[in-house]
Amino acid sequence: STFAQYKGLDVVKVANSQQPYINENIHIPDIEGYKTLKCDFHTHTIFSDGTIMPEERVWEGNRRGLDAIAITEHIEYRPHNSFIKADHNESYKIAKGVEKNANIIVIPGAEITRNKPLGHLNALFLKDANALDIEDPLIAIDNALEQGAFIMWNHPGWPNDTSTIYKVHQELIKQKKIHGIELVNGFEFYPIAFNFCKDYNLTYMGNTDIHGVYNQTYRTDRQYGPMTIVFARERSIEGIKEALFAHRSVVKFGDMLIGSENNLKALMKACLSYKIKPVKGNEAIMEISNKSTLNSV
């Protein structure tokens, strides 16, 4: 018997019983003059209302093939605070600790979490998230801006399935205090928000807003986890920040690509190659190859 064969051994390790390490292996080539970076700018951990630890969220990003991930805990909503005793910067600090080994850029952020009409906004590239923990959300936005933050208006169609741009948003956009809109969040797409981005010259954003375990939430066989594709001068937090403020982004949502005409053209040019084979006379065959793993190309 198998037991008889193992009898007398101290330890028997059965490696085949372990969950295999599977990477989504999403390949998107660099566009001309810029590096193409795959990013998720909206995630949560147990330090707000998520269910996993910050370091595991980073490793999930690694397995997804991301170049960057932002840790954006709710400022006002922390249901685990009876046993998670920490300030608003702690989850980022923990995530940052595995950044090098996971080979992924960890971006500090936070989510200002208020009811509509203001709604939820992510502040990215923060130096101190604690400065946002105040009663007046508009002052919280100003405090984030003083730190050089990029402000993203999150899921405009949630929770009432109506994407309304209220007066407060118009004023913030006019004052250059909102820089991008999350027109894809998780499983939802807000088509009218595409018009907001276009009309107000804002950055197109799409993210998971993941709270649970990624591979228990999204179909990994079809690359359905949304992401923001960023065209940066360099693979660094500074490069990503500059690119977002310069509106160099495209949203990937399942098989859809969403963005400005210029950015989409640049991406298609990088992904597709053409070869013309003469046949006879004036006839020829054009072969088009997809150099990416994007299903929409």
Go through the PLM ranges and name each one:
Residues 18-147, 154, 163, 176, ...:
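A metal-dependent hydrolase metal-coordination microenvironment
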Residues 2-3, 145:
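Compositionally biased regions
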Residues 3-39, 58, 116-126, 161-297:
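Charged catalytic cores and adjacent phosphate/nucleic-acid-binding surfaces used
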Residues 149-151, 204:
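Generic beta-sheet signal
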Residues 156-158:
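Conserved catalytic scaffold of divalent metal-dependent phosphoesterases
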